[in-house]
Each structure stands twice: as C-alpha cells, then as structure tokens.
Design a protein with these regions (language model features):
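Active-site Tyr-X1-5-Lys
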Residues: 1-16
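Flexible, glycine-rich beta-alpha linker
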Residues: 13-34
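C-terminal amphipathic/interface module of NAD(P)-dependent oxidoreductases
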Residues: 88, 127-162
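Glycine-rich Rossmann NAD(P)(H)-binding loop
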Residues: 47-52, 80-87, 98-102, 132, ...
Length: 162
C-alpha cells in the first residue's frame, strides 16, 4: 500500500486505499455465512455476551465510502478504514442473525469457559474462538472527516442483509 501511494504521488493519478471492516450484506461469505447457516440449521451454539467489540459495515455503505473516496480530492494519497462507526459484540451479531431468520434468541448461551477449554486443545481451535469472540475493532474517524456516514445498521437488518 505504502509503495503504491509513493509511486502514484509522482503522477496525476488519484489513488486512495480503503480497508473495509467485516462486511455484511446480500450473499455474505466466510464466517458470517457459516454462522448464519448454522443458526438456520440449528447447530450454531448461542454465543455468550463477552462484551467483545467488532467493527462491521454493510456492503451498500462500503460502496458509498468507495465512491466518496474516489470522488473527493482530499482523499488522494490517503488510507481509510471503512466501518459503520459502531461497535458490535458477537452476541449482538448472533441475535441480529436470529432476528433475520425469524428464530427466537435462546435465553441461555454456551458459557465462555467452554470456548476457552476448547481453545486450549489446539492452535486451530484457538484461532477460530479468537475470531468468534475476540475484539476486532477499528476507527473510521478519518473517513467520517471527509463526509462519510453509514446509512445501514446491524439493528435494521432483514433477510436481504445476508
């Protein structure tokens, strides 16, 4: 990224870099798709509220951010992080997905210590548990400083959001 910005700083090209946080939206892939599928089929465990913090952005807002950066001369040569500006816990994401699927949210959850025990069994499991229950939060203040404001939110999700 830095080499690209250095090379293009000597040209008249408008180059900016946008690093998206966890992206959700139609046809979501990766861990969010796996979680959604597991909740739908009934095998994904109810997550505990660990107060972890995760940044996310809806694909529509990411497109808006990309268009803003491409069109704003202040963005030339800059690196931005795209988020919806809110922090979400994994439990909130789990509950939102239950809502999308019209499934009731269980009143219980798998205790965190069971995830910790599983994580101690192998580095692969530890990595998965960390991705599921760990923090992954970023600031989009720099993007907001050029006028970006997310229009979609996790709490407003419906079946078209995944």
């Amino acid at each position: 990224e830095l080499k690209l910005l250095k090379i293009t700083s000597k040209t008249h090209l408008h180059v900016s870099i946008v690093r998206p946080s966890l992206v959700y939206g139609p046809n979501v892939k990766g861990n969010l798709q796996l979680m959604l599928s597991g909740i739908k089929k009934g095998w994904f465990p109810p997550l505990p509220e660990t107060k972890n913090r995760r940044s996310m952005i809806h694909v529509d807002d990411l497109v808006r951010a990309l268009l803003l950066v491409a069109d704003d001369s202040r963005a030339n040569g800059e690196i931005y992080i795209a988020t919806d500006g809110k922090l979400h816990s994994s439990r909130e994401i789990y509950e939102a997905m239950c809502g999308v699927l019209a499934k009731s949210v269980p009143q219980w959850s798998v205790p965190k210590f069971l995830f910790d025990i599983a994580a101690s069994m192998s580095s692969r499991i530890q990595y998965k548990v960390s991705k599921l229950l760990g923090d992954e939060c970023y600031s989009s203040e720099k993007l907001q400083s050029i006028g970006f404001k997310a229009q979609r939110s996790l709490k407003e999700m419906n079946e078209t959001c995944f």
